[in-house]
């Protein structure tokens, strides 16, 4: 949900997609986290469903 912040275990990240949208989706047991690349000016904020 909006405003929700969670700590995540890096070892649990299982999906990385840096093509096109430049995002890495980290699917963990404690929620879905989206890591935004800061070097891509075309990257837009994304809120997981």
Swiss-Prot record:
Residues annotated as transmembrane: none
GO cellular-component term (any): extracellular region
Keyword terms: Secreted, Toxin
Keyword Ligase carried by entry: no
GO molecular function: toxin activity
Localization (cell): Secreted
The keyword Ligase belongs to this UniProt entry's keyword annotation: no
The organism's place on the tree of life at top rank: Eukaryota
Function according to Swiss-Prot or TrEMBL: Very potent toxin that exhibits a wide range of toxicities over various organisms and cells including brine shrimp larvae (Artemia salina), sea hare eggs (Aplysia kurodai), mice, and cultured mammalian cells. A SOR-containing fraction cleaves plasmid DNA in a bivalent metal ion dependent manner suggesting genotoxicity of SOR.
Note: Negative results: does not show any hemagglutinating or hemolytic activity against rabbit erythrocytes. Does not show antimicrobial activity against both Gram-positive and -negative bacteria.
Protein name, entry field: Soritesidine
Organism for this UniProt entry: Spongosorites sp. (strain QM G324170) (Okinawan marine Sponge)
């Amino acid at each position: 949900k909006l405003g929700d912040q969670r700590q995540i275990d890096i070892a649990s990240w299982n999906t990385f997609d840096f093509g096109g949208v430049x995002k890495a989706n980290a699917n963990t047991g404690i929620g879905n986290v989206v890591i935004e690349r800061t070097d891509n000016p075309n990257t837009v904020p994304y809120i997981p469903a």
